[in-house]
Each structure stands twice: as structure tokens, then as C-alpha cells.
């Protein structure tokens, strides 16, 4: 069946941008049972095993006042081959006429894999590049060098076969080390990078060509957000366009969200208002190390000035509460210290840990009845023993050597062969954050 339902091989020259869709028409000579509409149901029931059962192909067609029911590929026109005894008997007993039927499958029928298998050079099927990451209306591909001569045709096929996709792009270089953005080329569709992406019950709007976004991290975003409790204060040091900050804000978590990329900051501000979390999420545009140090006083001042954030239940729930004479507002105290620091810049976030040295110097009293903050730092690792490597790197930056039991090493995903992404979670030691800052 796999070989049968496949378009004919098509020779494709490199760097073509358009496909001749007529090349993908394929006609099958089949046999159909001609019956009255009243008998279709009974025939379907009795002859079920002998009917044509191809994916996305209907087996009943109208012809004048009668129905043509397609039989399986092996059925002969005289009914002597390819049919079960039950079907043969049913046809004879009901004087059903068998007629030839030509079924034509065209470009619209075939899936992207089918088309690419037909036009790309011979190779392992799973190697043909039909996979992509969807970001809003954009399909983001990362084509290997061997497929670059066929990149425009590949893009065209992906565009044609995915109705929600309007633009197909290919990454043309490695991620920029400063802002995690990368150069991309439009392979097919419109030249429009402004996307709206849904994730974690939030909407995010941004220019995909100017900011970092990875839809494959949605599970990791949700994992950390679930650890934040209403009324917690979270410092999102490398916040991007807000995938941690905005959903956390919807949970009534106070978030100070920062990103150095001015385009990310601009989108972050927009997304805060788009998701109606401005009371809980504050946006900043600073260097990460500088922000870690300055955010302590920012939150302390915010806590003293505002004291609490008032929230109201949704209107429908508010009406029910009013009927029950329950309060319809809630005051959420603003804590003076952060419960969590999120550092989602896996290429270099560990190097920013030195900024925590002395960040709460002279403020020990704030933690009299509070736990010390947790840090969630994302990082890449290329070593077979990730725990040893990551502990050494944390020590080199923070100046504190954790035991393996003091750090949660969470495996996030494989980024490339011999390159994995982890999230290291640990509690900041008092000996580090309360230490007297070293001048100069």
C-alpha cells in the first residue's frame, strides 16, 4: 500500500522556485459496484473488507441516479479475483453490475512527505526535510546543507501543505550570541515576520526576525511557572518577549521581567498589556548582570510604595460573590524579596551568577521569616557527566561549591548531538548574597 499510494518520481533541477503540479497526477484503474442509493448501506456492511480503504479517499461516488462503490485494488472487473466469497455471493444475489472506474489523485491529495520523496534525490525517507517549528503563521526550518539546492521547492511544498502557514523561512547562520537571534531567508510565502503566538493561556506578539522564540520550550516554560505561587515575586533576568512573565502574571505572581534586546523589550511591554497583566508584570531593558543587582532595591521600593496589588474576580464570578455577600476584591501583598530568579539564556546565563554576590548585603532582616531565593539557570552541556561540569561552572561564577544533592539538574531537551540543555535549580546561599560587596 505504501508503494502504491505514492506519486511518481519527478526529476527536479536545483534552485527551482516553482512546481509543475500536473506532474503529480496519478491515475488508478479500479473496479466499482454500481448500486441504487438504497443498497449502499447494506453493501458497505456485507462487503466491508473488500471496499477501497485508502487514506483521505472516499469510496462512494454519484453517477446519475446511482452510486458507484469502489472495491479494493485487487478486484477484477468480472468479479472472479480479489474479492471474498461473501462479497461475490452478495454481488450475484443482487445482480450488481461491476464497472471500471478511474481514480485520479493529484498534487492536492499527496502529503508533504509524499511530494518531497518524489522530487528529492534518493536517500533515507526520514532524512527528507518535511519537519518544521511553527511560530504563528511562520514555518521555521533548519535545512541541512545537502538540501539547500532544493530549499525553495521544499519551502513551496511546506507552504502548500500546511493551511495555517503563510511564510516559510530557513535559518542561515548560528544564533547571535548577544540577543539569540539569527539570520533567516524566506523560502516561500509572504515576507512578514510579525507573528502572534499562543502559549500557556497567553498571546504573544513579536517580530520573529528580531527576537528569540522557541516553541519547543513551551513545556519548560509551564514547568517553571507551576512552581510560582500567587504572591511570589519572580525576577526574570532574561525574559525575552515574556513566555515566563505573562503566564506567571496571570497567576497573580509579581514579576520583574528584563531583556537587553530592545526589540524583545518592546514586545514584552506590548505582551504585558495584551494579556492584561500590567499590575503584576513590570518590564525593564537592562544588562542582565546589572538588573540582578538593581532589581533588589527596585522590588523593595515597589513593596514599600505600593504595599499590595488589588485584584477583582471576573465579572460573572464577581456577581455571584456579590449575591452571596462575599468580598469581591483581594489585596495581594507585595513581598520585599524575590522567591525565584529565572535565567533563561542557556548559552551564557551561568556567567551572570557572580552578580548575586552581596546583592542582599545589609538586608538580612528581610529574610527573617522568608526562605532564601531559588535560582533557575538554563545552560548547555556537552560533557558525559553533566552534574560535575555544571557544578564546576556554577562554582567558577558564583564562588560557592554546591554538592550534587543541593542542585536539581533538570534535563530540558537535546539541542544537537552532544549538546543538551539543562535547568539547574538551587537556593542562593546566605554566605553569598549577604556578603559585603568587593569594591572595584
Swiss-Prot record:
Superkingdom, taxonomy of origin: Eukaryota
Chief localisation class: mitochondrion
Residues binding S-adenosyl-L-methionine, per UniProt: 221, 259-260, 287-288, 344
Gene3D superfamilies membership: Met-10+ protein-like domains (3.30.300.110), Vaccinia Virus protein VP39 (3.40.50.150)
One cellular component (GO) term of this entry: mitochondrial matrix
Classification via PROSITE patterns: SAM_MT_TRM5_TYW2 (PS51684)
Leader peptide range in chain numbering: none
Transit peptide is among the record's keywords: no
Pfam families: TRM5-TYW2_MTfase, TYW2_N_2
Reactions it catalyzes: guanosine(37) in tRNA + S-adenosyl-L-methionine = N(1)-methylguanosine(37) in tRNA + S-adenosyl-L-homocysteine + H(+)
Subcellular location: Mitochondrion matrix; Nucleus; Cytoplasm
The keyword Transit peptide belongs to this UniProt entry's keyword annotation: no
GO biological processes: mitochondrial tRNA methylation; tRNA methylation; tRNA N1-guanine methylation
Keyword annotations of the record: Cytoplasm, Methyltransferase, Mitochondrion, Nucleus, S-adenosyl-L-methionine, Transferase, tRNA processing
Entry's Gene Ontology molecular function annotations: tRNA (guanine(37)-N1)-methyltransferase activity; tRNA methyltransferase activity
Class of enzymatic activity (EC top level): transferase
EC id: 2.1.1.228
Role: Specifically methylates the N1 position of guanosine-37 in various cytoplasmic and mitochondrial tRNAs. Methylation is not dependent on the nature of the nucleoside 5' of the target nucleoside. This is the first step in the biosynthesis of wybutosine (yW), a modified base adjacent to the anticodon of tRNAs and required for accurate decoding.
Family as reported in the entry's similarity comment: Belongs to the class I-like SAM-binding methyltransferase superfamily. TRM5/TYW2 family.
Self-association and partners: Monomer.
Name under which the protein is recorded: tRNA (guanine(37)-N(1))-methyltransferase
Organism (species): Schizosaccharomyces pombe (strain 972 / ATCC 24843) (Fission yeast)
Record gene name: trm5
Amino acid at each position: 500500500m505504501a508503494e502504491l499510494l505514492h506519486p511518481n518520481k519527478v526529476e527536479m533541477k536545483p534552485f527551482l522556485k516553482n512546481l509543475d503540479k500536473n506532474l503529480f497526477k496519478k491515475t488508478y484503474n479500479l473496479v466499482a459496484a454500481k448500486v441504487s442509493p438504497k443498497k449502499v448501506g447494506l453493501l458497505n456492511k456485507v462487503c466491508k473488507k473488500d471496499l477501497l480503504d485508502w487514506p483521505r479517499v472516499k469510496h462512494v461516488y454519484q453517477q446519475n441516479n446511482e452510486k458507484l462503490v469502489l472495491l479494493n485494488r485487487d478486484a477484477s472487473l468480472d468479479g472472479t479475483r480479489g474479492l471474498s466469497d461473501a462479497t461475490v455471493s452478495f454481488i450475484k444475489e443482487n445482480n450488481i453490475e461491476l464497472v471500471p472506474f478511474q481514480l485520479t489523485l493529484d498534487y492536492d491529495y499527496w502529503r508533504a512527505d509524499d511530494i518531497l520523496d518524489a522530487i528529492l534525490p534518493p536517500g533515507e525517507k526520514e532524512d527528507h526535510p518535511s519537519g518544521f517549528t511553527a511560530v504563528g503563521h511562520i514555518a521555521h526550518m533548519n535545512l541541512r546543507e545537502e538540501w539547500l539546492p532544493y530549499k525553495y521547492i521544499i519551502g513551496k511544498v511546506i507552504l502548500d501543505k500546511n493551511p495555517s502557514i503563510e511564510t516559510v523561512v530557513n535559518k542561515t547562520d548560528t544564533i547571535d550570541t548577544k540577543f539569540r537571534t539569527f539570520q533567516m531567508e524566506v523560502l516561500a510565502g509572504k515576507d512578514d515576520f510579525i507573528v502572534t503566538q499562543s502559549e500557556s493561556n497567553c498571546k504573544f506578539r513579536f517580530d520573529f526576525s528580531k527576537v528569540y522564540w522557541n516553541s519547543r520550550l513551551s513545556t519548560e516554560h509551564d514547568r517553571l511557572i507551576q512552581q510560582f505561587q500567587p504572591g511570589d515575586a519572580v525576577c526574570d533576568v532574561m525574559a525575552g518577549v515574556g513566555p515566563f512573565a505573562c503566564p506567571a502574571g496571570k497567576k497573580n505572581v509579581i514579576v520583574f521581567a528584563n531583556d537587553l534586546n530592545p526589540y524583545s523589550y518592546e514586545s514584552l511591554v506590548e505582551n504585558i498589556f495584551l494579556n492584561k497583566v500590567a499590575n503584576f508584570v513590570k518590564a525593564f531593558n537592562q544588562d542582565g548582570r546589572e538588573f540582578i543587582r538593581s532589581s533588589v532595591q527596585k522590588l523593595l521600593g515597589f513593596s514599600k510604595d505600593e504595599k499590595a496589588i488589588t485584584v477583582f474576580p471576573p465579572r460573572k464570578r464577581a456577581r455571584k460573590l456579590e449575591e452571596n455577600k462575599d468580598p469581591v476584591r483581594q489585596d495581594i501583598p507585595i513581598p520585599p524579596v524575590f522567591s525565584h530568579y529565572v535565567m533563561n539564556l542557556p548559552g551564557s546565563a551561568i556567567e551572570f551568577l557572580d552578580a548575586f554576590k552581596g546583592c542582599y548585603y545589609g538586608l538580612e532582616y528581610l529574610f527573617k521569616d522568608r526562605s532564601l531565593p531559588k535560582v533557575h539557570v538554563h545552560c548547555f552541556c556537552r560533557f558525559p557527566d553533566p552534574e560535575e561540569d555544571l557544578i564546576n561552572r556554577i562554582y567558577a561564577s558564583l564562588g560557592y561549591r554546591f554538592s550534587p544533592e543541593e542542585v536539581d539538574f533538570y534535563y530540558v531537551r537535546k539541542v544537537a548531538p552532544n549538546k543538551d540543555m539543562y535547568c539547574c535549580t538551587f537556593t542562593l546561599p546566605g554566605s553569598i548574597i549577604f556578603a559585603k560587596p568587593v569594591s572595584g
